A protein has these predicted regions:
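Acidic, metal/ion-coordinating pockets
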Residues: 1-227
Length: 228
C-alpha cells in the first residue's frame, strides 16, 4: 500500500484551461507549494508568467525583489491587490524565506499597509483551517481579525475542502471585512467525508466608489452542490 503524505504535481497545460474558464487571480501559496521542490516553484511561476496579461499570480517567488512587490491587477479601472498566505508547506522547507508567503502577523500588517497605499481594494487568499471541518478554527478567526484590523476588504479561504461560513468581521477603524472562511473544492471532491457533496461556494459582490472610497457591496453567497 501507499504510505506517507501525498505530493501533488499538475501538468502546466492546465493553466490555459483555467484562463479559458475565466480565472484572473491564482494563489500559489498553499501547503503543497513545495511538493516538487524549488524546480516546481520555478516551473509554477514561469507557467503563469505566460499569462501575466490575463492572470495575476501570487504567493510564491524566485527572488526577494519579486517578493517585496505588491501584486496588483486593474479591473475596469479598479486597482485590486491580491495578497496570499499559507499556514505551512507540510514537511518541505524552502531554501529561501521569500519563496512562499506564510502567515506572519507583522508581515501581513506591512503587506496590507503597502497594498492599501498602491491599490483601491485589497483581497487576501488565505490557505488555512482544518480539512473536512465546516467551522473555522481559532487560528482562522485570529487571522481574520488581523486582516480586518489591517483594513483588508475581502478574505477568500481555502484548504478545508468543504464549505465554511461567510462572515463580516469588524475592523478596529470601523471598517468591515468580508471573510469566506472556506469556499470548498472547485473541481474535485475527496474520497472520504462529505467533500464531494460540497463542491463549491461562490461569492458575488460589487466594488463601488463612494466619497472617494471603494466599498464591497451587494454580497451574494451561493453554494453549488455536486450531483451524486
Amino acid at each position: 500500500p501507499y504510505s506517507g503524505f501525498k505530493n501533488f504535481n499538475t501538468p502546466s497545460s492546465i493553466a490555459q484551461d483555467l484562463v479559458d474558464t475565466g480565472f484572473n487571480f491564482v494563489n500559489g501559496a498553499n501547503n503543497h507549494a513545495l511538493d516538487q521542490g524549488e524546480q516546481g516553484v520555478s516551473n509554477h511561476i514561469h507557467t503563469w508568467n505566460k499569462f501575466k496579461d490575463q492572470v495575476l499570480f501570487t504567493g510564491v517567488y524566485e527572488s526577494e525583489q519579486a517578493h517585496r512587490q505588491i501584486p496588483i491587477k486593474t479591473i475596469k479601472g479598479v486597482k485590486v491587490a491580491l495578497l496570499s498566505y499559507t499556514f505551512g508547506t507540510n514537511d518541505h522547507q524552502p531554501t529561501h524565506d521569500y519563496t512562499v508567503d506564510t502567515f506572519d502577523e507583522n508581515k501581513i500588517k506591512q503587506d496590507v499597509k503597502k497594498a492599501k497605499q498602491q491599490s483601491d481594494v485589497v483581497l487576501v487568499s488565505a490557505h488555512w483551517g482544518n480539512e473536512g471541518k465546516h467551522q473555522p478554527n481559532a487560528t482562522q478567526k485570529k487571522y481574520a481579525q488581523i486582516f480586518a484590523d489591517a483594513g483588508v476588504d475581502v478574505v477568500l479561504g481555502t484548504h478545508p475542502h468543504v464549505i465554511q461560513p461567510v462572515k463580516w468581521v469588524d475592523g478596529r477603524e470601523g471598517n468591515r471585512t468580508l471573510v469566506a472562511y472556506s469556499l470548498g473544492n472547485f473541481l474535485n471532491g475527496q474520497s472520504t467525508g462529505d467533500e464531494s457533496n460540497d463542491l463549491l461556494g461562490r461569492i458575488d459582490f460589487k466594488i463601488s466608489k463612494k466619497d472617494k472610497q471603494f466599498q464591497v457591496q451587494d454580497v451574494k453567497w451561493r453554494r453549488d452542490r455536486k450531483s451524486t
